[in-house]
Amino acid sequence: MEFDTIAAISTALGEGAIAIVRVSGDDAIEKVDRIFKGKDLTQVSSHTIHYGHIVDLDTNQVIEEVMVSIMRAPRTFTRENIVEINCHGGLVSVNKVLQLILAQGVRLAEPGEFTKRAFLNGRIDLSQAEAVMDLIRAKTDRAMNVAINQMEGRLSKLIGHLRQEILETLAHIEVNIDYPEYDDVEEMTHNILIEKATHVRAEIAKILETSKQGKILREGISTAIIGRPNVGKSSLLNSLVQEKKAIVTDIAGTTRDVIEEYVNVRGVPLKLIDTAGIRETEDIVERIGVERSKEMMSQADLVLIVVNYSEALTNEDEDLFRAVQGKDFIVIVNKTDLPQEIDMERVTDLAVGNRVITTSLIEEQGIDELEKAIADLFFEGTIDSADMTYVSNARHIGLLTQAGRTINDAIEAIENGVPIDMVQIDLTRAWEILGEITGDTVHESLIDQLFSQFCLGK
């Protein structure tokens, strides 16, 4: 496949030590060499770095002092010639370098175009390309490991094996249909076909078993901290974040808006939402905050209910317990450093089997137990993201689910005595659906849509 030469700034814009301009294309080296004062880049070896200066050809003025990396096709990310120019960080100089490159007839890259070329040139498949963005967005070590595993092609290999098994079954059916007179070909009986289809269905189900944990690692858990005013919600947020993000006072109703913060709890990414204290109020601004708190509570994956150890449960407390029934929630009984007034038996009854953790946030007690409870709630035992293949992408999960249903339709058809050549249609469809995960059978418009979500320069 032949493409034009593209360039973009690959590092985040702003002040910093280093900024990188990436150029990819058959004549990338020649284009950069025109504005580079130093060694003749067209003659240097691949995968080498060279010191020099970028020069404005119109004024012969030195624009930047740079280090230039030369990588020759096909041993590059895009399988094209790649040049990476390491400039000083900042807005003016790096943009000037980019402008000088574009002036040589190079096109500004679209978002994700470098990774798209890696896919179109066969270096990576679609699932590996999507893992690149997952790695960039990873918020925990576990999420990073899952993304790296997918980038290395672990999911691709699993999908490839399944597609190959379906393809061999389809070929076997085809031989039986077209050449029934061949005695040396094993007859594709209904029993053999059910056995093969059942195995594929089981393998798909096995992959999908990791989807809940995979999605959590990729997207995080939306976690709402709720409770009456002044029970310690903001203190809980600050303790989990290990930084003062929310105002903590003895004045009820201090938090009037929703505060969001990402935090890594034992490898589990939480999107923490500290809500306004829920109570009846005449204050218009506070009332708006209370309504938003209830909305966030209904949308959250996990709810942390905070109650006060030094106060008896109120009707408002009990209403909160009723409101979260059917959701994952943990009860935090805070302020155990003060005399007990709360009925712990009643709290346990209202928790209906969910974990109850006692804390004294002012004395930093109970946070470790809470973090363990959160991790245990979503990950039974230990999660080994280094050795397992987790499916975390919603697109992949949807396609695997669809393929599993199609295989199930094929099995039901076989059991109902449908002719094998009709069953072949369902198996072929399942093979095509699985191919959409790796990009083997995906439509071009979907490819464009997926890569448009990438950042510029990647």
Swiss-Prot record:
Q: Which residues form the TrmE-type G domain?
A: 220-379
Q: Where does GTP bind?
A: 230-235, 249-255, 274-277
Please tell me the species this chain comes from: Bacillus mycoides (strain KBAB4) (Bacillus weihenstephanensis)
Q: Which GO terms describe its molecular function?
A: GTP binding; GTPase activity; metal ion binding
Residues annotated as binding Mg(2+) are 234, 255
- Compartmental location: Cytoplasm
Q: How does it assemble?
A: Homodimer. Heterotetramer of two MnmE and two MnmG subunits.
**Descriptive protein name:** tRNA modification GTPase MnmE
One of its GO biological process terms is:
tRNA wobble uridine modification
The record's section on NCBIfam families has:
mnmE_trmE_thdF, PRK05291.1-3, small_GTP
Q: Which family does it belong to?
A: Belongs to the TRAFAC class TrmE-Era-EngA-EngB-Septin-like GTPase superfamily. TrmE GTPase family.
Q: Give the keywords, sorted.
A: Cytoplasm, GTP-binding, Hydrolase, Magnesium, Metal-binding, Nucleotide-binding, Potassium, tRNA processing
